[in-house]
Amino acid sequence: MMRIGLIVTTYNRPDALAAVLEGCLTQTDTNFEVIVADDGSAQETAALIDGYATRAPFSMRHVWQEDHGFRAAAIRNRALAATAADYIIFIDGDCVPPPGFVASHRRLAEPGWFLSGNRLMLTQAFSEQVLRDQLPIHLWSMGDWLQARRLGQIKRLLPLLRLPNLCWLRKRLPQRWQGAKTCNLSAWREDLLRVNGLDENYTGWGLEDSDLVIRLLRAGIFNKSARFAAPVFHLWHRENDRSQLAENRQRLQEALQATHIRASKGVDQY
């Protein structure tokens, strides 16, 4: 059976990370490890992870780097280098997985393809309530979510729908890079290493995941949709500093016109 590594990025938001780790504890498939990819959080986060590690029926590790601003690409690369798992699932530290999340990624994984999943966005007020009252949204039924929709706590129910595993439908847009994000993305580790992981030239918020997907496609690894099979519940957060977004957009445009597969500053540093 293939070994799965679930990489969870976080930065100084232990309450949201706790909700994510609670979701990890209830997975129906427990044959995976969690690597918390920490972009420079304070000691409170380390203590939280230590507490969960003692409860988890799977291995849990904390990979940390110093806080020098938003460096998601770098910490994901460090986490990727720290695991020997065959297959990697990326989520963010504010994206809560339901019980069948890992099992769905395992079921849909296929050589030559990466998986791009979807997310259900929670409103600010509801996210604050979830964290304050420690609501177990990862265990909610469709009836619970219907009530949340009626109350305006979520804007859409569509991401919660389940579709049968029709390969022709999931492989309908194999070259699509738009919309694939590391808040819910999975790939074979050997494919990620082949493209040298994420490009750490992307600093500040935005588009490092798009660059990764573009290079995977260029390497002959295609996009298979995990929508309507493996959603995550995305807690609201304040908008990140986007001061470097224009520079990252320019870098992505250059990447779209280029032919390279490997990141010039990637996982091979570690």
Region locations from a protein language model:
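Cell-envelope/extracellular polymer assembly enzymes that use nucleotide-activated donors
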Residues: 3-5, 33, 211
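Acidic helix N-cap motif at the loop->helix transition within catalytic regions
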Residues: 18, 43-51, 100
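Short, acidic, metal-binding catalytic loop of nucleotide-sugar glycosyltransferases
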Residues: 22-31
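A conserved acidic beta->alpha catalytic loop
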Residues: 23, 38-49, 95
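Short beta-strand/loop segment that forms part of the nucleotide-sugar
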Residues: 31-41, 61-65
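Glycine-rich, basic loop-to-helix element that forms the pyrophosphate-binding segment
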Residues: 66-83, 100
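Short aromatic/hydrophobic "clamp" motif used to bind/position activated sugar donors
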Residues: 88
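Conserved donor NDP-sugar-binding/catalytic core segment of glycosyltransferases
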Residues: 100-149
